[in-house]
Structure formats: structure tokens, C-alpha cells
Amino acid sequence: MKMEASVRLRALAIAVTSGVMLLVPLGGIVSLGGIALAAPASPSPASDPAGSSIITIGDSVMLGARWVLEKDGIEVVDAVKNRQASAGSGLLKKRGSNLPMNVVVHLGTNGTFTADDCRAMIAAAGPTRRVFFLTLAVPRPWEAKNNAVIRNCVAANPGRAFVIDWNASVEQHPKWVYSDGTHLRPAGAKGYSRMIEQAVAAAP
């Protein structure tokens, strides 16, 4: 039983596609080595000291999950309304050596997310830290382009940057968000927090 559980954990919603480490939440269907796997459902994790190794940087979407992120042990949740992706690198630079090992970014909801924005955030995080970028679920003209930028940027920075596919999660769980297709209902906030913690734990 222990071995079976260990295998399931290692199979935790990780798919390698075109050089991109793609992380999606439990309960989803993922492709691993060409084989479709249905990841088992899992309850929200209990508060964990590992959360202190994570900082999250985001906008109003992340702000809607702040109460769960903090409850689940993530000590630093830096999220404000209307934040643009261009602000990300400056926020990371201000924290400097105080940044934890894992940086989670959810920006681009409110406008353009450029390749320069992405590269600047990875550089600002420093060479020893991992940066996780959530894809966007925002029914606006810039959604597809921003998500493509995120995926391409991550593919160009293997081992340092990772994609957490929030867009796919919202497609799978449309009731996680309100009628605007973007902001989180309580169930979505819980799924959002769980997804981030599991992605960080599963990344190599």
C-alpha cells in the first residue's frame, strides 16, 4: 500500500509537454509519457510548515484565495487588485535575499504579460529559486496571448520555471469561478490553494 501511494504521489498531475513542466491539480486528467492518467481526488492539505518556503505574487484572483493560502500555511501572500505583470520583477527585487525558495506568480489578468516581464521576474528571483507561473482564466482578448507567453518563457527556462495550468483547472471546474469567468468562489479558492501547494511539492 505504501508503494502504491508513493507511485500515485509521484504521478501527481505532472506532464512534460514540449519541454514544459506542466503542473495541474489532482482530480484532473493528465498525460504522462503518452499515457492518460486520472489523478485521484485529494482533500485540502493541512497547514504545513513547507508553506513558509513559498511566496505568492498576484492580483485580485489570488487575493480571493488569500484566506485559504494563509490557512494552508503560505506565510507571504502579496496580492492586490489591478496589479499588472510589469510590477512583478520590482516586487521580487525589493524582497531580495528574503525571498523563499519557491516563487508563485499569478499576473496578467488585467492586461499584457510580455516575454520581458517573464524573464525579468525569473532574473529577479535569482538563480537558486524556482518560479511557478499560473496560466490565466480571464475571458478577455489577451488571455490566449498571455498564456502562450507564459508557456514559451517557461520552456526557455527548464528547471527554473514551471507552469501551473490554472486555465485548464477552470475549464474542468467552471463553478470554481463567478460569472465573470475569473474571480474565485470559495470552492475555487480552496482548489487554487491546493493546486499551488501540490505543484510546488511535485516539481523536481
Give a label for each model feature:
Residues M1-V7:
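N-terminal secretory signal peptides that target proteins for export/translocation
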Residues R8-V30:
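Sec-dependent N-terminal signal peptides
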Residues L23-A50:
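C-terminal region of N-terminal signal peptides and the immediate post-cleavage residues
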Residues S47, N98-P100, N167-A168, L184:
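Catalytic phosphate/metal-binding cores of nucleic-acid and nucleotide-processing enzymes, i.e., regions
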Residues D48-A120, V138-K145:
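Conserved SGNH/GDSL esterase-like catalytic core that processes O-acyl groups on lipids
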Residues I55-I57, F132, F162-I164:
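Hydrophobic/aromatic beta-strand patches that form the interior of the parallel beta-sheet core
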Residues P127-V131:
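A short helix->loop->beta-strand "cap" motif at the edges of active sites that frequently abuts
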Residues E143-P204:
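Catalytic His-Asp segment of secreted/periplasmic serine-dependent ester chemistry enzymes
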